[in-house]
């Protein structure tokens, strides 16, 4: 009998481990345990949802403060070296480029600009600024509006330039000749209406403005507002409704033949079919859809 007892002592740990595994498996498939686990997950999400919102607000606030820091005024540089150097330093620090009179385009390198270069350009006015893609906002325009001899300004794809910023460009009306606003997501037709002060403009780029509701009509009105300016942007017919005469003319000139209609005797043989009149879309365009003031009289037919 000793041999069977010894064998039982050897087999007992293995059997206990197996039964514990079965008990653990029964706990895993227990419906009450799964419900408790679901409640725990929901409680976890509920407890940390406010924390996620707090982190999101913190990151957004941090981004706003970063943009404000980039658009601060360099008062010390302006007082010591003048407005030309201060404006150029502001643009170069954001990754843009500037062009002083009778000089080549200047961009900041990894080491930046030395004070000796600023002293040499202290009395040289800035004629052109390329701030494409820079984080310039309403506050940061203070550094550019002091450049009274500025002739060319590029604000392409600036994410923070909006209609309020365009309302301040009248301060450059005496010198500004070229302006690029292409790709600015916050500029609408209301902001473009503020450009009527810039009568010395010779070239204006308003292409790819997603906030403009009717690009074709907007370009027509801008051309009437600035008659001596070359306006670049969307096609004049983009967003306009085509009248019945234009539709019939386009159908006649189309290389694709129209679908052949049924003969009259076949149409009459169908019982209960009445002839339906063809509805033509209206060709009128409401100028009040732009919603902006300052455009003046629109184009009349």
Swiss-Prot record:
Q: Gly residues composition bias: which ranges?
A: 289-301
Q: What is its main location?
A: mitochondrion
Which residues does UniProt assign to the signal peptide?
none
Q: Per the record's keyword annotation, is Mitochondrion included, yes or no?
A: yes
Which InterPro entries does UniProt cross-reference here?
Answer: LRR_dom_sf
State the residue spans of region: Disordered. Answer: 242-301
Tell me which UniProt keywords the record has, alphabetically: Mitochondrion, Phosphoprotein
Query: What protein family does this chain belong to?
Result: Belongs to the ATP synthase subunit s family.
Subunit note: Interacts with incompletely assembled mitochondrial NADH:ubiquinone oxidoreductase complex (complex I).
Described by its record, this protein's role is as follows: Required for the assembly of the mitochondrial NADH:ubiquinone oxidoreductase complex (complex I). Involved in the assembly of the distal region of complex I.
| Record protein name field | Distal membrane-arm assembly complex protein 2
Q: What is the lineage of its organism?
A: Eukaryota, Metazoa, Chordata, Craniata, Vertebrata
